[in-house]
């Protein structure tokens, strides 16, 4: 994530979830953003301003009339400088103030003066959140252009269980990144991505699978989301959901095949990063297979060739990207697969190369199309995903010029 040159104003209000916000401030500052933190006085009861000052290297402002802080009309200069405001956690009280234009502290004053994108993450007791007054106030904020980040559900600090939890740090950071990090050059595109390994059952207890974690597919989904695409992620992974992305679960190759047919054929791009089984048990035992002396033989049968089917039925607008996991003859085998299955691009990687393959956060790949072969050095899967998105965008642009 690269937010260099961006100014972000974080508004922290008086809820217990304020303790989570140092992680968000640190992540944004680490990404290069100039982070300024505004706190309500009640917020300082939960966490001290010094924490944010240490993490951001900027003065944390609480009092609108702080005479020890030299700033050119602070609320105006901060409002003008901000590329984005994130108010999290946002209490029912502050949400009500903002919805009705009240500006009685530095946070609400800067928010009222700012013209940048504004994100609000409600965090409160379930009954307070579901109160019609709070819901009307949130709708009012949306009417005025605020983006309301949906609350999570679970055990709350008050002991109740329900909605009202502040979303995880990564979700808040993704909302910021979607607004600021990239040109929205995939706006209007529908992209379908598959991720994770298939699980082919042998009996009610066991199944055949592989080492795929889904990290590469999730990185591609996130990259396309950040660039403005409408993304559907077909997944067997238990990784956290990607914000703004439609999640469609699958387990077996047959379920993935049906999900591809249902979601991908009217898309602009299909990126098949899932590790799909080539074989499955021909018969699934109705009861657990018991251990006994001697060998156990399981008859296998071929699964459907999903990419092969897509290649045969591919509509003109659909860009198809597959993955090739090899241990030798990487380029030759991957290029042959590209042509055989009528793909537009194949991402080839050798699982024997250190830092590549399953379960790690990095990859070493070669992007192969009909006209070029680009070898990428060891880098994060997020960076690889951006390179894949680059090829999708460039291919679409070339087609539009014809």
Walk through the language-model features, giving the residues of each.
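A cross-family phosphate/adenosyl-ligand binding-site feature
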Residues: 1-119, 125-402
């Amino acid at each position: 994530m690269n937010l260099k040159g961006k100014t972000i104003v974080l508004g922290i209000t008086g809820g217990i979830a304020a303790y989570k916000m140092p992680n968000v401030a640190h992540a944004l500052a680490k990404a290069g953003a100039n982070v300024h933190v505004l706190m309500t006085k009640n917020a300082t009861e939960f966490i001290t301003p010094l924490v944010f000052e240490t993490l951001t290297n900027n003065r944390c402002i609480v009092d609108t009339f702080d005479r020890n802080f030299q700033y050119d009309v602070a609320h105006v200069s901060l409002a003008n400088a901000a590329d984005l405001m994130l108010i999290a956690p946002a209490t029912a009280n502050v949400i009500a103030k903002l919805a009705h234009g009240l500006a009685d502290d530095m946070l609400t004053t800067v928010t009222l003066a700012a013209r940048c994108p504004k994100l609000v993450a409600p965090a409160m007791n379930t009954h307070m959140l579901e109160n019609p007054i709070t819901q009307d106030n949130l709708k009012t904020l949306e009417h005025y252009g605020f983006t309301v980040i949906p609350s999570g559900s679970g055990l709350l600090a008050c002991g109740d269980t329900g909605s009202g939890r502040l979303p995880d740090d990564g979700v808040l950071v993704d909302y910021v990144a979607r607004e600021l990090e990239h040109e929205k050059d995939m706006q209007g595109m529908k992209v379908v991505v598959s991720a994770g390994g298939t699980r082919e059952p042998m009996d009610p207890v066991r199944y055949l699978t592989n080492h795929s974690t889904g990290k590469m597919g999730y990185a591609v989904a996130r990259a396309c989301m950040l660039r403005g695409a409408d993304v559907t992620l077909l997944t067997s992974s238990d990784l956290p959901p990607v914000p703004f992305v439609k999640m469609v679960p699958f387990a077996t190759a047959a379920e993935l095949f049906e999900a591809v047919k249902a979601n991908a054929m009217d898309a602009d791009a299909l990126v098949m990063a899932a590790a799909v089984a080539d074989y499955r048990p021909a018969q699934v035992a109705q009861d657990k297979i018991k251990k006994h002396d001697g060998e156990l033989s399981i008859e296998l049968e071929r699964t459907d060739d999903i990419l092969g089917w897509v290649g045969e039925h591919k509509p003109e607008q659909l860009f198809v990207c597959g993955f090739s996991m090899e241990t030798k003859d990487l380029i030759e085998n991957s290029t042959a697969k590209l042509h055989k299955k009528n793909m537009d691009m194949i991402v080839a990687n050798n699982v024997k190369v250190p830092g590549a393959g399953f379960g790690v956060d990095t990859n070493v790949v070669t992007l192969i199309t009909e006209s070029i072969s680009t070898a990428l050095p060891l880098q994060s899967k997020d960076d690889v995903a951006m390179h894949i998105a680059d090829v999708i965008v460039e291919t679409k642009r070339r087609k539009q010029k014809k």
